[in-house]
């Protein structure tokens, strides 16, 4: 109550921020007449003037009025478009490390040119991040003329570009690309074997378009570069045959382990668990199939991988549905993004889940992979000095943006008042009744010439609606993961009079639906159109546009509520752009997933009290409130999971930063011999201490063990027992010194053979390769630790603190192993002649260049909904697969098995 009163008196933080910024907008508007007088050359010269002022110590924020006025004028001359005042506000919000919520159709792409230009003046680079390659290319090419007019360079960062082209793109003042590609380049740079192989500069300023999609929806998605692991495809096939024989428990009571069925399903957290009966049943079937020995337990340590196969197969059969979570195309399982409805070609679920789905569908099973490098989007984007983003729907996630990314959300007002009518939800008892009502609504509206956009949450649902429309004789177009090639075209024409378009979820995001259709698309189909043809097309469009407005504008139909209010708002936001007329309504049934899982008891109770008859709908504020509360519950739990994942990942992030920092220092230094010498002393001291304890009696020494260790691990033949027998005066200190000096002398002989420079290169290569190999193993060990750490809670221990403590101990052990491995490899290596080493280096360079041209990226993602502790790491992973005989992704030019795949 008190907060509401204070807000009424002083205004909200959002209002105060906008009031402050409007004063700057007024200043920019006052500058406009003067800027208009400048010639093109004088306008372009302003960029050099701004750069000079920055070099002389000016603060970037002091340039905002002039810089924005210059960009606005340049836009008028290049595009014939003038930035609205609200776009200037949006530009200032984006410069202040904030999220700008700007409604659909308000010109976010043009708004982004303002902060992009301003922050590029420092010469440190600006990354404009989009959700797909099409938008990255489109926005870069559309805005290139403006930036080049002002003397700035523009680069596009796309998958499969050769390294020199990527380096040039990053060297540009403003670089457009996708979140995936920026993240993968960061990982690849930290696998490089020379400074020249890196492509990115320091991460300065990132401007993220559709920021909610990237920083919220994909927050659980790690980017992974991986290599091949052991082939176990046969086991997936054998286990897959057993799963259909298991029976689901009918009642999901609290005691799932003691249930009557073989497995229970927790739909809220998307988990499946074997019951006691199920465990006995699966063990019997595994024994019958000859997979497990009689009397063995599935939970015994020897069968841990078998348990992994059973769990993956059970999840594949029960939780993942064809044409909802994935499609099968050309003998391949392709994931469908739950947030956009788009197919994610090349992405794969991790932890054997994808292989289990492939076995279920009877397609070829691809090998599992082992992580070489990994980072989540949460941690990647927090590496930027300055981060900002824009979207049409951010306010519902404002708390998460603030708590995780330290980004405030500012709602930017629309240029024209929003007049869309958002009608109350209609709730039916059954899915069939709901679909019937939707068809009738579409029939009535299209009869009046009103275009309709139907939003569904899955391919399966879109095909059900499509089939019913076909049966009713209503023409329509379907836009889902199966037909996404024509996405932009279908969406742009969805505003034609009487058009009916079915869109899975938020497919087509980034393309506006213009009432009356897109006249630009019609002109694009003509070869060299005349002015008369263009005028005729525009005139015909104007008639259609006016007719659609008269019919009520675009009508949005949601076939069910999404778990997140934000996704529902995105669907609604397709109508009512730039002050146009429009309307929206959601149709729900008690059989919808959200209603069934979260709101069923309360709403069905209301419906019974009201005496609902078949075909009747309930429309009541209580129902709308119950649904909103259900969505808040899901959003809250999703946020808690993302936050928990981040807390765990922050531990790995600190270690990643330390490793990558050390690695970059190694890359930038030509001579690492001092480091090698220091490490050698530490390693030999540790080895000798384990056989000859400090200040111990000679009877306690294990001389034979020490001789064997030096021979096996360092290829050093040292007759220590003979020395002690021949030289009674040889004591502990002098013995230690002799062993170390002989090891150094042996190494120096090798250096004399190959030469100083070659040995320095070799040392550097061994250190980098060993570091990468051990880091890869450490990542796998961290994953295993993470999977079981929640069990510490049963021992009254805090799992997070235990994870931090143990992961630090593992990290320290890894660094000790690094020292040991490096000295061991350098001591045992058989050196080549300088000519051979040089020839190998030339070959490596040539292969690295060839690799850059042929690199193929594939990504891995898990769009499974919610996960509990032990399942957290099964979260989505974007993965790049590398075969044993493929070129190593680090860019060394060697085969993977001879480079990062060697020291395993």
Curated annotation (Swiss-Prot):
Cofactor section: Zn(2+)
SUPFAM superfamilies associated with the record: Helical scaffold and wing domains of SecA, P-loop containing nucleoside triphosphate hydrolases, Pre-protein crosslinking domain of SecA
Localisation per UniProt entry: Cell inner membrane; Cytoplasm
Membrane topology: Peripheral membrane protein
Catalytic reactions of this protein: ATP + H2O + cellular proteinSide 1 = ADP + phosphate + cellular proteinSide 2
Binding-site list for ATP: 87, 105-109, 512
Co-factor binding comment: May bind 1 zinc ion per subunit.
Listed name of the protein: Protein translocase subunit SecA
């Amino acid at each position: 109550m008190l907060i509401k009163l204070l807000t009424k008196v002083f205004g909200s933080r959002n209002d105060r921020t906008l009031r402050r910024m409007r004063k700057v907008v007024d200043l920019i508007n006052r500058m406009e007449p003067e800027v208009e007088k400048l010639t093109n050359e004088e306008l372009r010269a302003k960029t050099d003037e701004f750069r000079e002022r920055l070099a002389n110590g000016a603060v970037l924020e002091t340039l905002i009025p002039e810089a924005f006025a210059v960009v606005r004028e340049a836009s008028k001359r290049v595009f014939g478009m003038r930035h609205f005042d609200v776009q200037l506000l949006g530009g200032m919000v984006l410069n202040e490390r904030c999220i700008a919520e700007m409604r659909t159709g308000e010109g976010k792409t043009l708004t982004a040119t303002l902060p992009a230009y301003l922050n590029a003046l420092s010469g440190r680079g600006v990354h404009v991040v989009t959700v797909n390659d099409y938008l990255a290319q489109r926005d870069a090419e559309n805005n290139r003329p403006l930036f080049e007019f002002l003397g700035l360079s523009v680069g596009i960062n796309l998958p499969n570009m050769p390294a020199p082209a990527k380096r040039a793109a990053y060297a540009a003042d403003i670089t457009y690309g996708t979140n995936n590609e920026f993240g993968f380049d960061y990982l690849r740079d930290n696998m490089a074997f020379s400074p020249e192989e890196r492509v990115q500069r320091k991460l300065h300023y990132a401007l993220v378009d559709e920021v909610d999609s990237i920083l919220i929806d994909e927050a659980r998605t790690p980017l992974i570069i991986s290599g091949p692991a052991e082939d176990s495809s046969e086991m997936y096939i054998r286990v897959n045959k057993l799963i259909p024989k298991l029976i689901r428990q009918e009642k999901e009571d609290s005691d799932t382990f003691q249930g009557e069925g073989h497995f229970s399903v927790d739909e809220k957290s998307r988990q499946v668990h074997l019951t006691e009966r199920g465990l006995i049943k699966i063990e019997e079937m595994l024994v019958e199939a000859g997979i497990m020995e009689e009397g063995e337990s599935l939970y015994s340590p020897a069968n841990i991988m078998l348990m992994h196969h059973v769990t993956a197969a059970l999840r594949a059969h029960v939780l993942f549905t064809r044409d909802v979570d994935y499609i099968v195309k050309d003998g391949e399982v392709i994931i469908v993004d739950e947030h956009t409805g788009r197919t994610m070609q090349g992405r794969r679920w991790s932890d054997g889940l994808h292989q289990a789905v492939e076995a279920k569908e009877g397609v070829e099973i691809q090998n599992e992979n082992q992580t070489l490098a990994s980072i989540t989007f949460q941690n990647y984007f927090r590496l930027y000095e300055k981060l900002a983003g824009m979207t049409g729907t951010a306010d519902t996630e404002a708390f998460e943006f603030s708590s995780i990314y330290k980004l405030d959300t500012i709602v930017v007002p629309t240029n024209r008042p929003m007049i869309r009518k958002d009608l109350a939800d209609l709730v039916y008892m059954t899915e069939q009744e709901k679909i019937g009502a939707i068809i009738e609504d579409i029939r009535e509206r299209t009869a009046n010439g009103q275009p309709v956009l139907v939003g569904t949450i899955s391919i399966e649902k879109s095909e059900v609606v499509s089939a019913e429309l076909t049966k009713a004789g209503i023409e329509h177009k379907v836009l889902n993961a199966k037909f996404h090639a024509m996405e932009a075209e279908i969406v742009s024409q969805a505003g034609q009079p009487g058009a009916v378009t079915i869109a899975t979820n938020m497919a087509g995001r980034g393309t506006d639906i213009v009432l009356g259709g897109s006249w630009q698309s019609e002109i694009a189909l003509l070869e060299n159109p005349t002015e008369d043809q263009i005028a005729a097309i525009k005139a015909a469009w104007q008639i259609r546009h006016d007719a659609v407005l008269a019919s009520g504008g675009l009508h949005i139909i949601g076939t069910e509520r999404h778990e997140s209010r934000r996704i529902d708002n995105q669907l609604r936001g397709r109508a009512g752009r730039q002050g146009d007329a429009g309307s929206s309504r959601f149709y729900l049934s008690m059989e919808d997933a959200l209603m069934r899982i979260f709101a069923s008891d309360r709403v069905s109770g209301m419906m019974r009290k009201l005496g609902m008859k078949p075909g009747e709908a309930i429309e009541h504020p209580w129902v709308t409130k119950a649904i909103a509360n259900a969505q808040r519950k899901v959003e809250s739990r999703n946020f808690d999971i993302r936050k928990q994942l981040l807390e765990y990942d922050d531990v790995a992030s600190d270690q990643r930063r330390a490793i990558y920092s050390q690695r970059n220092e190694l890359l930038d230094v030509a001579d690492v011999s001092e480091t090698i010498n220091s490490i050698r002393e530490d390693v030999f001291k540790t080895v000798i201490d384990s056989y000859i304890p400090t200040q111990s009696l000679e009877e306690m020494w294990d001389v034979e063990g020490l001789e064997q260790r030096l021979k096996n691990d360092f290829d050093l033949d040292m007759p220590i027992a003979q020395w002690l027998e021949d030289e009674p005066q040889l004591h502990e200190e002098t013995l230690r010194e002799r062993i170390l000096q002989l090891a150094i002398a042996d190494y120096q002989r090798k250096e004399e053979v190959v030469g100083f420079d070659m040995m320095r290169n070799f040392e550097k290569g061994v250190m980098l390769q060993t570091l990468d190999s051990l880091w890869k193993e450490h990542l796998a060990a961290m994953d295993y630790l993470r999977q079981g750490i929640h069990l510490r809670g049963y021992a009254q221990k805090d799992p997070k603190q235990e994870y931090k403590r143990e992961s630090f101990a593992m990290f320290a052990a890894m660094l000790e192993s690094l020292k040991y491995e490096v000295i061991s490899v350098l001591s045992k290596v058989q050196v080549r002649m300088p000519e051979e080493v040089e020839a190998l280096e030339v070959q490596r360079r040539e292969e690295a260049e060839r690799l850059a041209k042929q690199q193929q990226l594939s990504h891995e993602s898990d769009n499974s909904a919610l996960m509990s502790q032990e399942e957290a790491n099964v979260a989505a992973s974007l993965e790049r697969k590398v075969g044993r005989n493929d070129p190593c992704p680090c860019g060394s030019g060697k085969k993977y098995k001879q480079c990062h795949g060697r020291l395993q």
